[in-house]
Amino acid sequence: MSFNAKDMTQGGQIASMRIRMFSQIANIMLYCLFIFFWILVGLVLWIKISWQTFVNGCIYWWCTTLEGMRDLIKSQPVYEIQYYGKTFRMNAAQVLHDKYMIWCSEQLWSAFVLAAVVALVICLITFFVVSWILGRQGKQQSENEVTGGRQLTDNPKDVARMLKKDGKDSDIRIGDLPIIRDSEIQNFCLHGTVGAGKSEVIRRLANYARQRGDMVVIYDRSGEFVKSYYDPSIDKILNPLDARCAAWDLWKECLTQPDFDNTANTLIPMGTKEDPFWQGSGRTIFAEAAYLMRNDPNRSYSKLVDTLLSIKIEKLRTYLRNSPAANLVEEKIEKTAISIRAVLTNYVKAIRYLQGIEHNGEPFTIRDWMRGVREDQKNGWLFISSNADTHASLKPVISMWLSIAIRGLLAMGENRNRRVWFFCDELPTLHKLPDLVEILPEARKFGGCYVFGIQSYAQLEDIYGEKAAASLFDVMNTRAFFRSPSHKIAEFAAGEIGEKEHLKASEQYSYGADPVRDGVSTGKDMERQTLVSYSDIQSLPDLTCYVTLPGPYPAVKLSLKYQTRPKVAPEFIPRDINPEMENRLSAVLAAREAEGRQMASLFEPDVPEVVSGEDVTQAEQPQQPVSPAINDKKSDSGVNVPAGGIEQELKMKPEEEMEQQLPPGISESGEVVDMAAYEAWQQENHPDIQQQMQRREEVNINVHRERGEDVEPGDDF
């Protein structure tokens, strides 16, 4: 409410102008309806009675009207009455008492009443129809006119009716919204911050997958899905630290050299900033060593780790001779080989957690498990799980397993009617899956249904790169956008939901003291606008999202309700690991990492030393050729030799000094020869070394870089 004179003047002028304009329209409508009423009455009378009856009836009612004035009229009028071709002459008194004339008057009156009722009803209907048409036209003039783009609705049942009308509604629903039939093979993307509701959507889809008996591979980072869905009779778990872990066999899983290469590509990912030589060399050594061990009857994960990390570099060189990896451990570049093995340590150390799982029953391979899919009965699920405190250590192995499962889909053969689900919440918490970009577009031919949850599109770009991330995101057709707090990410989500093209209506008023100046002008301008603003994305409550379906269907604002699920199994059961073997492997890893740190220092640029005036004078003398022998003598005087490449002579400590740095009880090859001495040294110097080794960050220690580059791709999220 405002008592400001300006506001009251403006409001009064506009109200007065509206009243005048409404009065004009009302007068025109009533005038037209009045004329229309009598036209209708005349038409009904013409249809209902004859002309003779109409005329005679009118004469009767005219005489009735003049009856009270008959005594005042000196000369009584005579009326000619038509009666079926005959003419009779009657005065007013005769007309009023004639039975035929009375009958004609009754017929005329009844016909007139009927005609008036019919005309009134028609006029009322006409009035409302005209009012609705005029109101609709006025509303259209004042509303935006949509000319293209996508629409937005907050009622999922409207979209459900559209899908049902088109015959494309599916039995799979997210809340009240059905997805498009068979669109599950076109993949899902769940985008939003933590705790917004992505896992709830995955659970809704997982319920349908369990009811239909579909095969499912699910990445469970926290154990929540194991707790709610694990069925030990048909399901499998892959978690190196879980007692229920299947006895996965690397050498039965990988039958050919390319299989080992693919496994190494995921186990040892390429960094985004580091020199790819180090990771690529580590991949080659791991793949070749594992391939050579396939025919060893005593092969095991412990032996594989020992071969790669424990034995001397000379023995590793002998083991890899006549293989493509032999060039990477040659004696001429031994220092580089030691650095490559240090890189290998960061990722292969995750394999040590697999030691002992071969005793967990029959050998298990993901490839054979997926080939055993049955369409006539319910299929099992594969849970690839971890927990928060061990995820960083298990990430290479988990990424490797998931990559094998993704490739295993192609080995199942083409079948569009089959459904194999891959649920991966928080996908960027894994290493880059190299085959995902190529396999995802083709997976629909094999019945693959991928459901990926990400916190932001920036995570995909950080892990996979700009172009690969765009390719992945483009093949995820059904999308749900939950809350994104940051402006940039929320703006991206708003753009992906879509925009509409419309003619935006505008209305302007002009008024003045003279009514001639009063007027209203309307117009429309073309405009493109996003369906939702980034602020709408930022302010979404939990369990509320915008869902976009493939095809010409509106975007839907969907609200979900959390559904509690009973606990059917423990999320995690610790597995007993051989402590002696674990201690030995920990010691080996400690030795290799210490060796890697020493080698890393050799590849760092030297800091120039401040020299005295004498040295400056000597340095101004012309340089003379220096023989290698003289150079060795001068190496003790503090002159630094730059480490510019792998072919240069690098200053190394004597082997005796290296042995002195190893803990007591550790041999030169890194093996534990005196467990009691080593454990005593641990208790005295490093009481918490075991815990530190388990949780050590996976840092590339072989190239000099900034501290910020030590983070794995995706660890910032």
Curated annotation (Swiss-Prot):
Keyword Acetylation among record annotations: no
Membrane topology qualifier: Multi-pass membrane protein
TM stretches of this protein: 28-47, 105-130
Positions of the UniProt region annotated as Disordered: 614-639, 650-669
SUPFAM superfamilies to which the protein is assigned, alphabetical: P-loop containing nucleoside triphosphate hydrolases
Gene3D superfamilies in alphabetical order: Magnesium chelatase subunit I, C-Terminal domain (1.10.8.80), P-loop containing nucleotide triphosphate hydrolases (3.40.50.300)
Effect of residue 712 to K: No change in conjugation efficiency. Partially rescues a TraM K-99 mutation
GO cellular component: plasma membrane
Cytoplasmic-side positions: 1-27, 131-717
Primary site of residence: membrane
Gene Ontology biological process: unidirectional conjugation
Family per record: Belongs to the TrwB coupling protein family.
Function according to Swiss-Prot or TrEMBL: Conjugative DNA transfer (CDT) is the unidirectional transfer of ssDNA plasmid from a donor to a recipient cell. It is the central mechanism by which antibiotic resistance and virulence factors are propagated in bacterial populations. Couples the transferosome to a type IV secretion system. Probably forms a pore through which single-stranded plasmid DNA is transferred to the secretion system. The last 37 residues are important for determining plasmid specificity and transfer efficiency, with additional specificity conferred by the TraD-TraM pair.
Subunit-structure text: Interacts with relaxosome component TraM. May form a hexamer in the membrane.
Identification of the protein by name: Coupling protein TraD
Organism, as annotated: Escherichia coli (strain K12)
Gene name as annotated: traD
